[in-house]
Amino acid sequence: MNKQVVYFSNSGNNKRLAQRIADYNGLSAIPIIPTNTYPSNYHELTSRARQERFHHIDVQIHPVKLAKNTDTLILVSPIWYADLPRPVITFLKQLQRPYQRIIFVSDKFMLGFGFCRRTLRKYVPSSTNIEMIAATSNDFSTIISILKNS
């Protein structure tokens, strides 16, 4: 299977995790970058993320180039307010074709995946197999076991 790693990370935790996954697979990790960067101040960041989430604000992102022969998309992202961050939703809306499999990986897993599966399902075809992995860059064993089976 041809894999591609795409990630969104504001603090750097999910970036490190995505790079580790990409290195394991001999790939590069492609970032999802909002055109309007998020503030580094925690209060300002959470205020903006909360407003985007609950008002369903579309967040513009820089173009993400994906290989045409990819059948497995490994999407690494935090979970903000029990759902995917709005830049990730913009990315999903811009996908040009279906994927056989999407593996969603999140670092800083605390309360579960919330609405993430529902949101992924909303933007990808029903034929796409969605897998969810809670992991950290320090404990890579769960990710390795899933990736070995792909």
Where are these regions (language model features)?
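Redox-cofactor binding/interface segments in oxidoreductases and associated redox assembly factors
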Residues: L75-V76, F104
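N-terminal beta1-alpha1-beta2 submodule of the flavodoxin-like/Rossmannoid cofactor-binding fold
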Residues: M1-L75, A82-I89, K93, S126, ...
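Glycine-rich phosphate/pyrophosphate-binding loop and the adjoining helix
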Residues: T128-S150
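Short beta-alpha junction loops
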Residues: S106-G112
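Short, charged, surface-exposed secondary-structure boundary motifs
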Residues: T37-H43, G114-F115, D139-T142
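Short, aromatic/basic amphipathic alpha-helical patches
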Residues: F115-S126
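A short helix->loop->beta-strand "cap" motif at the edges of active sites that frequently abuts
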Residues: R97-R101, S126
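Short glycine-rich anion-binding loops that position phosphate/pyrophosphate groups of nucleotides
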Residues: P78-Y81, F109
